[in-house]
Amino acid sequence: LRLVGSEMCIRDRVKKENDLNQGKWIGIGGKFEDGESPEDCILRETWEETGLTLTDYRYRGLVTFVSDEAPTEYMHLFTATGWTGTPHPCDEGELAWIKKAELRGLPMWEGDKIFLRLLEENVPFFSLKLQYQGDRLDRAVLNGRRIV
């Protein structure tokens, strides 16, 4: 996920069939490869999905996704304000620079709206647990305290 001034670079998952995120706007990122740290992973995934090399980025939080339909997943959140390179098309979805004020109007997971707000408010490093029943956010716990 990249926050840059008043805009954010995210992608619409329209290209992958049978994708859990189909039709939703999500941040840039992916799965760890063997031996990678969170920093290694975000640098590689950003380059693979955008063609950009991050030069100034910050580790912001950890999100735990719990679902009744899938195994638990963990997402490491980063924001970036510096990069080099020229964006290229992504085979996983359409990349776009979206104004922060327009983000909440896009189709996205309800829990994503929570961590986007935390990032925009510059909350210090946080742990967020999001629990879903199907596509519905059932519970959100921020730093051990229930918020939804």
Residue ranges with predicted function:
Residues 1-10:
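Single conserved hydrophobic/aromatic residue that forms the stacking wall/gate
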Residues 18:
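Phosphate-binding core of ATP-grasp and ATP-grasp-like enzymes
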Residues 22-25:
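A positional/architectural concept
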Residues 28:
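Substrate-binding/active-site groove segments that recognize
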Residues 32-55, 65-119, 140-148:
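Unchanged
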